[in-house]
Each structure stands twice: as structure tokens, then as C-alpha cells.
Amino acid sequence: MVIAVEGGFVHEEEEVDHPIRYLPLGRVYSSSAPCPLPKKPRSAEDGKPPVIVYYRRRRKKPRVEGPPPSPATAPPMLHPREDDEDEEVTRRKGSLKYELLSLGQAPPALGGDGEEPARRRCLRRSGGAERRGYFSEPKRRQRQGVHKEAASSAGRRWLELEIEAADPLAFVGLGCKVFWPLDEDWYKGSITGYNEATKKHSVKYDDGESEDLNLADERIKFSISSEEMKCRNLKFGISNLNKRGYDELLALAVSLHDYQGLDPGDLVWAKLTGHAMWPAVVVDESNVPANRALKPGRLDQSILVQFFGTHDFARIKLKQAVPFLNGLLSSLHLKCKQARFYRSLEEAKEFLCTQLLPENMLQLQKSMEKGSSDANSNKDVHSCDNLSEDKTAESGGDYDEMTPIELGNLRVSKLGRIVTDSDYFHNKKHIWPEGYTAFRKFRSVKDPHVVILYKMEVLRNSDIKARPLFRVTSEDGTQIDGSTPNTCWKEIYCRLKEKQRNVASGLDRDVCQGSGSYMFGFSNPQIRQLIQELPNARSCLKYFENAGDTFRGYRAVHVNWKDLDYCSVCDMDEEYEDNLFLQCDKCRMMVHARCYGELEPLNGVLWLCNLCRPEAPRVSPRCCLCPVTGGAMKPTTDGRWAHLACAIWIPETCLKDVKRMEPIDGLSRINKDRWKLLCSICGVAYGACIQCSHPTCRVAYHPLCARAADLCVELEDDDKIHLMLLDEDEDPCIRLLSYCKKHRQPSTERPSLESNLAKPAVVVQTDAVPPSGCARTEPYNIHGRRGQKQPQVMATASVKRLYVENMPYIVSGFCQNRVGHDAISEPIQSVGFLDVAHQEAVGNVSSMIEKYKSMKATFRRRLAFGKSRIHGFGVFAKVSHKAGDMMIEYIGELVRPPISDIRERRIYNSLVGAGTYMFRIDDERVIDATRAGSIAHLINHSCEPNCYSRVISVLGDEHIIIFAKRDINPWEELTYDYRFVSSDQRLPCYCGFPKCRGVVNDVEAEGQSAKIRVNRSELFQQ
């Protein structure tokens, strides 16, 4: 506890030889309390610090409910007279400035029963009643029985459960307790029901109030036993602790905001020239050591601060200091990505919780240097003891109640907590949480023929508080302590070998081969993943820096991929019979089956990627090689996750199983200089980068950042691959090349739209060559229209085309015209309700067959045709669609390729102004939608389309489906790329987009088809 005296701050352990200026409220208003006198110096024989009576905000609650004390035995309540209550509250606000530093709460008006009425406030993300408002009036709660621990049934414990993957009705009837951040307390209740419409559970608290909550967004625990978890099919869940860190810090700042200013002991954001805003604490002049040379300044216009993390002192102006809460609301905690900045935030959070500065900060202050070395050492040990006890009481309870994890012969009962005040509780390979407890069966050191249970613990060393102590205790009473896990188990192995020498026992040599980390369970991938997800795990810099997943400089990069029809791994859009496209039915990610390692065909059943499956991590993992979120990710050999594209492009990484494309290996072989490269595109100093393949260029970038920036990330030139001398038995070596924006290869020259209009096209009757996998559609040709064909007429028609707007044709049914009635308002209003229903339907996860049936049943209500700005008629969306949605099926007459060629040459080409609507399924089937079909054949071509075509298989039948390539807004025209392939025809394009290539033809495909490739072995055959 911190008490303000004349001349600065003094802790309750320190000795003062002058009168105390500020006293607790209990001693001020107590008639029986003795007059405060200065304390005498402590004698050297005293082993404990003197006991000082101090004021507590709340009484310590017992664990077991007991009978209420009788009026005769109850302690006297200290409170002012009722008529002077308002006057005393006003007078006490200023006098408790320094006393509140150790309390962390506002001084309430004491009630008649001696306890303050609890003010329950809420800081939620979801909207709700007025009392959830951020600045709304807090509602008083009468919590007579909320904090009382009821005698629970045997086997019940408070656990956090998996919510998203569980049945919502399985939680109904369970007891629960919800954490309210602003109150920093749990409120008990029970789940009474579930609303299917709002997707929320009804919670009724023990004090009589009730509310509807989305359990996935709350910090909630359930009272449940192991048998009930199995019956209800519930699983133990790990909460999103990273998200809670900011909420807890904000809640602490809100609770102390009214009493935070620029006085000594207040928390602020301080600004120094050339540095980011940094959390600091205001200190007094007497706390600054004499050897610190600070910049002089006027006392009334400057303050002294000590920064968290760096522990440096500085004198700043008043305008350079910002209250801590205001800085959090202004997102100052996101302005810096340095490791010491994150450590300063953790120290600031610890200060708000305990109102005690870190030990290193106190040692640097002048008041810590006055005492003798013995007193300082005793005080340091005592403060460390208190700190360990406080932290254990604060966070240890959550992990004591975890469900034991069974991993073969290993059983982990407690994960413990991450130690942030010492760097000795982790190294480059492992993290050792304090309080970690595990059990393992092994041979007894007394009788090697008997297998007993060993208990393994990670404790804090009582002699050296900054170092861990590993303890192994057996059932027969043997206890072994060591500084490392290997030390403990090495001693056990030595005793077993010594016993083997004395007694002729057939002890196997392989029994004593396991390392200490293996025996404790720290090398297990599942345990390692759980430890990494503990709170404050990212503060273990040595561990994460060695793994390349350093927390320093990380910032998530969200990429809005425009080409949803491209594979997320190889970035190709071609689909083959033996390598079909797969789309995740939940996140809409598109990959090739071989690129993702799916060996068995799906046949239209539900398919989910690794991150969307039920066994996936609850918190979406981030790639350890780049900051880009989402995408095709696979697990690594060390328990992390990485993009397949990153693993393919980084030279040191590889795949252990190429067929299944997992796991990713070789992260430890990545050159340490590659981790230090800064991406020139996203600017995030995180992950491993590749460099430009130009001989003299060293520009670095992440592989996915380069793909998002349209840089050249491709295979080596095909013209050079055939020159490589390879044996037929060897796998061909393919070199991956990437070029920066300056050195990327120039794109193929695309013909301009004006050149196509200036030169009239000459129609040549040739044998129609069926294209591969694209629509055979001929846009309307203005040169083939009837009437005059002079250049003036063509120019007039082209100018007129620019002023034509999209006019959808809306079918509204019969309605009688009347004055002031808008005939289009009713259909638009009805479409609005359809939009909401469609969005709700799309949000559900369904298989390919279910999506196909839903598309067939609703495409008439979702789509309409009308006048198009591009050409003739087009198809428009009535409602909004998400990327990956099925839009419509391309329907027509199924014919053989020879029949389609005859129809096109003899009939369709002779019709003036008629188009050819043929879509090829494979080499044996073509869909002719010229005379029969749906409105899908009216979808126009665009060089920057919002849809794409794809052949899917549903119940053994193949269908051509038009998919949404990106999110489509209402009344937006649908377009896709025809990719017309013809060596002698050039069809002009009128889409008008900035990246228009001028023609409908697929120039790249035509160039590749013109090349003739012959295997090198065939050239030398006789």
C-alpha cells in the first residue's frame, strides 16, 4: 500500500520517523482508534515487517459460505452520520488522492450496512439496452447472494467451454457466471433458454435480473461436471485472451479515470520528440536519482515521468501528457510495434491492477537507494513474495479449474501462468509457466520393477525469485528439485542405473532415454500450442524470436482478393479433370484438390478447409511466415500454421508429404537474415520475405503481398525450361522467379479499342474451332447492322452507346396506375425483404448439392434482365450477393461438337445481328443456348468481370454454373470473361473498364496454343 507523506511516497514496508499526514478512513472516523503516532525504527531482530492497519475497499470473501455473524460478535461498522453524509463525501474526495493509489476504486458513500452498493457497469461489443451504453448511467445492483459460494454438487467445476461448435440448446439449464469488465467481477446465474431468431441465450442472474447474451462474445464460465460434458457433447474451450487484453486494460483505465490526473502516481501517455506516445507514471522530484541529468524546466509547466518498459526518467511539458484512458480510446496502444512497447503495456496493466510499480522501476528511484543493502534485500524478497502470491491468487484460479488433458502416459492438470517479470522462465525452445503441473507413470527409483506415478511441477525458486524451480515428486515420497527439467530426470535416471548395478534387474536401456522436456510434456505439440495461447505468452521474446514468429512489429494485413476464381495456392484459374477446384463451404476459399492435398473426390458433399473444420483452433491462427490473414494454411512441424504459398516460395521450407501437402517443415533452417528483411509492399517487419530475381535488385516482399500487388510471381520462362538436361527418372526441377515493380516483365500489348473501331472487321467463313472451357459468344457487331455504314454513322452510334444506362427489366405483376403512385416502389420494397432473407440463407454452411438446389429455386427472384450499357440486354442482380455465391446455371441444348460446328457455320453465322451462345463442357459435349435456355446467355463479357464460370458435378451430372467473383451490389450487372479463342477472328470488347484488353479474345491462351512442345526424348528416337 502506498501512503502519501511529506516529501514523497512511502510504502507500508518502509519506516518513517516523522508524523503521518494521511490516514485511512477507518481511523479518521473511529472513536476507539488510538491517536496515530510515528513508528519507531524496526530492530534488526524483527524478521517480519511491522503490521500496519490500513483501509480495504471490500472485505475478503470466504471460500465457503458460513452463517452470518450475530450482532453481538459482528465488528463495529465505521460510517459517518447520515445527516453529514453528503458533506463528508465532498470533503473526502480531495483527501483520498494518494490513498486511492493502493485501492484502485472510487470512494463510495458508505451505506447503512457498512458495504458499498455494487455499481455494475458493462463494456460490451454487442448492442442492447440503454444500460449497455458506454456513457450511460450505471445501474445499481443488489448482490446479496451473488458473491456467496453455494455448496455445489460433487464433481462440478467452473470451466470455459467451446461455444461456436457446440449445440446452442446444450447450454440451457447450466449454471454460469459472466464477467463484467468495468466491475472486474463475476456475476452468477443460469442459462434459461435460447432464441433461434436472435441467436442469443437468456441468462437469469441470482439477483433477479436477466438479459440476452451472445455467449461467443462474452467471458463466461459454466458449472459442469465431466459426466455432464460427455452427455451434452460439450468440449473444453480456450478463450480468445488476446482480445480480452485490451478490454481488461480499458476496464481498469475506466475505473480509475476520475482519479487520474497529472499528480505523482498517475498514469499518463508521455510524448518525447522522435518517439511514439509511451505509457508512463508521474513521479515526484524526490524520486529521481541525483545522477539523472534531466532537462530543466518550470515546475508549473512541466512534470516528471518514468516510462514503463524502458524505466527511464524525463521531464515533459504538460501538453505532451495525455490521460491514459483518453490515449486508449485514441488507439495510442497501436501506434508502436516495438517489443519493449508491448512490455510497457503489460507493466502498465499490472500497475493498474496492483497499484505497485515493477521492482526495477522502484530500484531506479531515489527513495530505494537510501536504505541499507540488507533492508533492501529483505524488502525485495518480501515484495517478490507478495507479488507471487497476488498473481497466483489473481490468475491461478482459472487454470486450476481446467479439465485435465490426457496424452497417453502424460496427464496435464494445470497449465499455470506466464511469468512476465523474469526472463528465466523461458528459453529459445520452451516456455515454463509457473504453476504448471503434470503427472506421468514411470519406474520407481526404489524398486525398478514397480511403476508408480510421478508429479512434475514448475515453481518459483524461494532463494532466487527470478529463477524457476522444477520439482518431481513420486508416490513413494521421493522429491527431486532442479534448475531445469533435464536436471531432475537425469537424477532419476542415475538412481535407476545405480539401483540396476546393485540389484540384477532387467532394466531396458531405452527407458532412460527421454529428455526432461519430453517427460514434463513441454515438447508435446499440443501442450506447446496451449502454452502459447496463455495470457502474456507473447512477452517471451527469446522463444518467439527464435521461432521466427516474433511479436515485435506484427500487424495484420487484410487483402481483399479480387480473383476469387483463382487457386489460393498456385494462383492459377485452369481446372483439369484430374485436378478440380474445391471451394470451402464456410470461408469460400478456392483451391485445387492437388494443391491442397485432397486425394479423394468429394462428389458434391460438404467440404471445409483445415481452419473451418470442427477440430480446427478456436482462434484463427496467423501465418508464421507473413502477416496476411486468411488463405490456404497448413500446420507446421513445430505446432504453428503457415500459408502453403509462403512455404512453396521460401527456399528453405518444404513439405514432408507432397501428396497431402502437409506438414510444412524447414522453418528452423530459414536464414536469420531473411527474418530481418522488411517488406516493401506492406511495410510490416514480420515474417520471412523473398527478394527480386533480378541480378542487381534486392527489393524484398512477402510472397502473398507480391501476389496481391500484381507483381510477377511465376515459374521460370517455359522457353528456358526445355534446355535443362534432366534424366527421365528424375523429377523436373522448376525454378520460381519473382520480380519487383521496376523489373517485372512487360505485359502483352493489347490492341486499343479505337484501332478496332477504325478498321472494319472482315468476316471470313472458316471452320469453327471449338474453344476449350469458355463461352462461344459473339457480341453485337455494329458493322453488320442494316442501313448506312459510313464512318459518320459508326461514330454516332459509338457516342450514343456511351450514354445508354443500365435499365433492368422488373417484373412487378398487375397494378393499376393512379395519381402519385410510383409503380416501381413496391417491387423495390419487396426486394429489400428478399435481400435480408437471402443474406440469412447464404450465411448458413451448406454443401454443393444444397447450394445448387437453392440457386435453382431462387434465381428468378434474385436476377432480372434489362438494357445493358455494354451491349444489348444484360443480366442484373436484384439483391446483394457475396463472393462465391452461385448466381445462375448456363442452360441450353446438349449437342455433340460436330453438330455445334454445323449449326454455327450453316445457320447462326447467316443471321444478321444474332449471337452464338455455345458453351463447351468437355471434348464430347457442348451446350447450345441460342434457341433454348435461360437468361444466363444474356450475361455480357467484361475484361474485369464480377463473375466466373465453372463446371461442377452434382449427383453424377455436370453443370455449368456462374459464380460471383466478388461481392455484388443490388442492380449491378453480371459479367464474366468469355475467353474467346480464335486464330483468325478478333471480336472487339466494349466493357469500358480501365484494364480492358480491347478484344474478347484470350490473347495469352492463343499465344500459348501457338507454341509447339515436343519432349526432348522424342527428338532422339530412331
Swiss-Prot record:
Q: What results from gene inactivation?
A: Late-flowering phenotype under long day (LD) conditions.
A single cellular component GO annotation: chromatin
Q: Name one GO biological process term.
A: regulation of transcription by RNA polymerase II
Annotated PWWP domain ranges read 264-327
Alphabetized InterPro entries for the sequence:
ATX1/2_ePHD, ATX1/2_PHD, EPHD, FYrich_C, FYrich_N, Histone_Mod_Regulator, PE/DAG-bd, Post-SET_dom
- Name used for this protein in its record: Histone-lysine N-methyltransferase TRX1
Which positions fall inside the Post-SET domain?
985-1001
| Annotated binding of S-adenosyl-L-methionine, by residue | Y978
Zinc finger extent (PHD-type): 564-615, 677-744
Pfam families, sorted: FYRC (PF05965), FYRN (PF05964), PHD_2 (PF13831), PWWP (PF00855), SET (PF00856), zf-HC5HC2H_2 (PF13832)
The gene designation is TRX1
Name the residue ranges with Pro residues bias: 65-78
The record, for Gene3D superfamilies, names: 2.30.30.140, 3.30.160.360, SET domain (2.170.270.10), Zinc/RING finger domain, C3HC4 (zinc finger) (3.30.40.10)
Q: Name one GO molecular function term.
A: histone methyltransferase activity
List residues of the FYR C-terminal domain. 465-548
Family (UniProt): Belongs to the class V-like SAM-binding methyltransferase superfamily. Histone-lysine methyltransferase family. TRX/MLL subfamily.
